[in-house]
Amino acid sequence: MNHPDFPPIGDPQLKLEALTHRSYCNEHPGTPSYDRLEFLGDAVLGFVVGRILFERYPHFTEAELTRLRSQLVNQNQLAYLARFLHIAPEIRLSQSLARDDGQSSPSILADVFESLLGAALLDRGLTAVEDFIQELFVPILEQWEKSQDGRSPKLVPTMDVKSMLQQWALAKTKQLPEYELINTSGPPHAQEFTFTVKVAGKIHGQGSGPSKQIATKQAALEALKSLGLLQ
């Protein structure tokens, strides 16, 4: 899935603030962190996504709308989007947190996604932020709708975990993940497949499912969790 570009933030100081983790501020006293902008971004994201869902699904109950919104904007989903928008390299962290690969932390990535939304709101206005959120989340909903019965939100909108793992592996090791079928069980009409996934020769995840596609996705998901990229 292609993602739109983040609204450009013309004020360089505002953008720097949106990218600054509080650990960086401990080493650079007087530097503002992204916490206040994250608060603002969280509020506008919840509002805009809530309105999208309200208008798109008039037959959903309040509880269903609330559940779907929480699935769309949870930490893992926002961290996934932040990675594909290439936000991580710009985040300012303390030296120790940077050495520990803090830019890959799902919580930090999700926080910075929201803080940049807050900065964009102040710099570009509500319309630009609304347009960006629409462009970002409506395709996710359209993909999700294809697997639904049109009556209730039964499934979480899924992230492309295999693409996420591939991007991480290429960035860190310059190698593609390797999936290996290690077991097939069950009768021909109800088979169960089990795959492992390796990165740079090391097994990081294993998954099973009724199809090879589902099994490899599960393996990728487990690998992302073991690497600390998802929680």
Curated annotation (Swiss-Prot):
SUPFAM superfamilies: dsRNA-binding domain-like, RNase III domain-like
Protein function: Digests double-stranded RNA. Involved in the processing of primary rRNA transcript to yield the immediate precursors to the large and small rRNAs (23S and 16S). Processes some mRNAs, and tRNAs when they are encoded in the rRNA operon. Processes pre-crRNA and tracrRNA of type II CRISPR loci if present in the organism.
Names of required cofactors: Mg(2+)
The keyword rRNA-binding appears for this protein: yes
Catalytic reaction(s) noted: Endonucleolytic cleavage to 5'-phosphomonoester
Subunit and partners: Homodimer.
GO CC terms in record: cytosol
A biological-process GO annotation: rRNA processing
Pfam family, one: dsrm
Keywords for this protein: Cytoplasm, Endonuclease, Hydrolase, Magnesium, Metal-binding, mRNA processing, Nuclease, RNA-binding, rRNA processing, rRNA-binding, tRNA processing
Protein biosynthesis recorded as keyword: no
Annotated Mg(2+) binding sites: 38, 111, 114
Primary location recorded for the protein, binned into one broad class: cytoplasm
InterPro entries: dsRBD_dom, RNase_III, RNase_III_dom, RNase_III_sf
Active site, renumbered: 42, 114
PROSITE patterns: DS_RBD, RNASE_3_1, RNASE_3_2
SMART domains: DSRM, RIBOc
Enzyme class: hydrolase
Domain of life: Bacteria
Segments forming domain RNase III: 1-125
EC number, UniProt record: 3.1.26.3
GO function terms (MF aspect): double-stranded RNA binding; metal ion binding; ribonuclease III activity; rRNA binding
Subcellular location: Cytoplasm
Span of domain DRBM: 160-229
Protein name: Ribonuclease 3 1
